[in-house]
């Protein structure tokens, strides 16, 4: 394998890109994981479809703990934060109750957009451009 200096690599990329030939950077692909975001955030991310996404399933992954994201604006208000935590705990209590009696894909309907999720993203360099 021949090694090339960074300047030469940059020139090789800059020429076709400056001529509008962006397909050359579609061959470099990146896969990364985004962890601990809310489902509300993940839905905003995937709705634009600039990449391939695999999101943690609420159907096949047990949602045993009240694992959720609290928006900063709620966290700054002590009473609002307290009520938010109480509500999340209550939602999980009801989810656990339902998941013992109905299929998990039906029980998950009560889970909020605040649920923590993980998502794997794969995209090429052009999508990151």
Identify the meaning behind each predicted range.
Residues 1-129:
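Family-specific signature for flavin-dependent thymidylate synthase
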């Amino acid at each position: 394998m021949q090694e090339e200096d960074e300047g030469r690599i940059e020139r090789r990329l800059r020429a076709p890109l400056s001529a509008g030939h962006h397909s050359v950077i579609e061959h470099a692909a990146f896969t990364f994981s985004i962890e601990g975001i809310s489902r509300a955030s993940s839905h905003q991310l995937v709705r634009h479809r600039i990449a391939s996404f695999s999101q943690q399933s609420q159907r096949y992954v047990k949602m045993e703990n009240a694992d959720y994201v609290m928006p900063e604006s709620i966290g700054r208000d002590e009473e609002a934060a307290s009520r938010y935590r109480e509500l999340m705990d209550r939602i999980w209590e009801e989810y656990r109750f339902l998941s013992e009696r109905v299929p998990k894909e039906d029980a998950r309907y009560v889970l909020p957009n605040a649920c923590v999720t993980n998502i794997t993203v794969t995209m090429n360099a052009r999508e990151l451009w």
